[in-house]
């Protein structure tokens, strides 16, 4: 993935001053339990590469967060070794009494804002592309949610208590249709959220048909029954929502009021609902319109009939040097266990692994004595055109305990039926959380427990090099 924020790069360079904080709001809806609908690590890596390595933003000034979810491991495991000083934050950490809603919502938790957003000088909204709910008359079938999730709904992950907002975004067809209040508009207009955002990015590498579903292929051109494999980027939050909706609606039905909040936001000074929004002084939060048809995908600026949206497809040079993949078969080396690196590149004149020339496609076994970063670079015309980094962690101080000793320490209990139970003091309303992990009855196990951050979040539990759980 080569993510270059052309216009936004200029914007950041012109405005950014050393020491200012940047918050990156990602979507980690799956809580780290699987990779069904989480932000893709490669996409966040590409963004951090731009900010840190190209724009020279200090790592400690960047926070990647989703304050409503516990799934930060979806990206932490891959990115923290490469960018260790970036702050990776998930559940918790809210500032009270920050957000005012224009109608219906008075819950104190809903008025609290994630500290990462509150303290940031700039926001980058990095959302996913997905239909949130199927059209239905039964709110239970739709999980009581909105039509699509993109940059607007993404900010629900910045709010302390989300359920009070759900009523205003639901489509019960006959209950709440067009021209009604929508709390997403209040978030889009808020000075610490929409008002503080440099760029809106939609990670459309994959598209999901429902809030907890698996990715689906798109049938129409240019996807041609393939993965969407795309990014959308804009400085206009209403425009990017409009385009996301058009793409999704061209492949699957959406809720009847899916674009209600877009109409409200585009006309926030005089919305169809008649609601006096808190941000009404802004008159409009952006441009809302729909394309002419799903085959040509032309908006008013494309058609030269108005000054609305222009959908511009950034051309990619098919001959550009690229890293197709670069990964290791395990994230850490324990004692003498070998680790294998794999890579595939294209269109380069020279490929370097930590400065040494290697084949364009290949693999190698490494046994670093200490944790070590590996950098794969592809050169053409004497300059590096593509680069990717990964870190292999090395653990040599491995201590062995039998079951009885482990039970005495209280760190693990291996039960007769082959379950390992780990307990922590963080996670549930009662202050305790229990995991049960199926393990073979015999064998050798390595337990890696790591902790990061100034509070109890996040912490991670690994069993045999596999993430077991987090937030202990």
Task: Give names to the regions the model predicted.
Residues 355-360, 427:
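Short beta-strand segments within Ig-like beta-sandwich modules, predominantly Fibronectin type-III
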Residues 395-472:
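Extracytoplasmic
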Residues 383-393:
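Edge beta-strands of extracellular beta-sandwich domains
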Residues 330-337:
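Short, solvent-exposed loop/linker segments at the N-terminal edge
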Residues 319-328:
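Proline-enriched interdomain boundary motifs that mark the N-terminal boundary
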Residues 358-374:
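Solvent-exposed segments in extracellular or luminal domains encompassing
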Residues 2, 8-34, 38-318:
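Extended, low-polarity segments enriched in aliphatic/aromatic residues
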């Amino acid at each position: 993935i080569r993510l270059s924020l052309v216009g936004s790069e200029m914007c950041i360079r012109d405005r950014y001053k050393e020491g200012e904080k940047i918050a990156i709001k990602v979507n980690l809806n799956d809580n780290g339990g699987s990779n069904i609908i989480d932000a893709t690590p490669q996409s966040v890596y590409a963004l951090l590469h731009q900010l840190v390595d190209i724009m020279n933003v200090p790592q400690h000034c960047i926070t990647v967060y989703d304050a409503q979810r516990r799934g930060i491991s979806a990206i932490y495991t891959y990115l923290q070794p490469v960018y260790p000083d970036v702050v990776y934050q998930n559940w918790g950490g809210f500032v009270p009494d920050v957000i005012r809603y224009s109608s219906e919502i008075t819950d104190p938790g809903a008025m609290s804002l994630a500290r990462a957003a509150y303290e940031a000088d700039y926001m980058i909204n990095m959302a996913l592309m997905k239909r949130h709910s199927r059209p239905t008359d039964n709110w239970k079938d739709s999980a009581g949610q909105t039509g699509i999730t993109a940059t607007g709904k993404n900010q629900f992950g910045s709010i302390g208590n989300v359920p009070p907002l759900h009523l205003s975004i639901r489509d019960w067809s006959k209950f709440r249709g067009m021209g009604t209040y929508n709390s997403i508009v209040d978030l889009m207009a808020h000075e610490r959220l929409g008002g503080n955002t440099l760029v809106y990015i939609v990670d459309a590498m994959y598209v999901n048909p429902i809030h907890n579903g698996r990715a689906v292929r798109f049938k129409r051109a240019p996807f041609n029954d393939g993965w969407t494999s795309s990014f959308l980027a804009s400085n206009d939050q209403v425009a990017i929502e409009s385009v996301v909706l058009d793409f999704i609606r061209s492949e699957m039905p959406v809720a009847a009021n899916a674009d209600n909040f877009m109409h409200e936001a585009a006309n926030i000074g005089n919305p169809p609902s008649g609601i006096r929004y808190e941000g009404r002084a802004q008159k409009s939060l952006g441009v809302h319109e729909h394309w002419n048809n799903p085959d040509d995908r032309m908006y008013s600026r494309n058609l030269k009939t108005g000054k609305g949206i222009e959908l511009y497809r950034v051309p990619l040079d098919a001959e550009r040097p690229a890293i197709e993949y670069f990964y290791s078969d395990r994230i850490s080396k324990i004692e003498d266990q070998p680790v294998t690196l794999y890579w595939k590149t294209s269109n380069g004149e020279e490929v370097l692994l930590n400065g040494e020339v290697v084949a364009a496609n290949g693999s190698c076994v490494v046994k670093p004595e200490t944790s070590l970063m590996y950098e794969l670079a592809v050169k053409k015309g004497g300059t590096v055109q593509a680069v990717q980094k990964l870190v292999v962690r090395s653990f040599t101080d491995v201590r062995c305990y039998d079951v009885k000793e482990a039970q005495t320490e209280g760190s693990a209990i291996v039960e007769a039926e082959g379950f390992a139970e780990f307990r922590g003091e963080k996670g549930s309303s009662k202050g305790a959380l229990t995991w049960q992990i199926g393990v073979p009855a015999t064998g050798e196990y390595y337990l890696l427990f790591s902790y990061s951050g100034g509070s109890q979040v996040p912490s991670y539990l690994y069993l045999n090099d596999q993430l077991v759980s987090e937030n202990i």
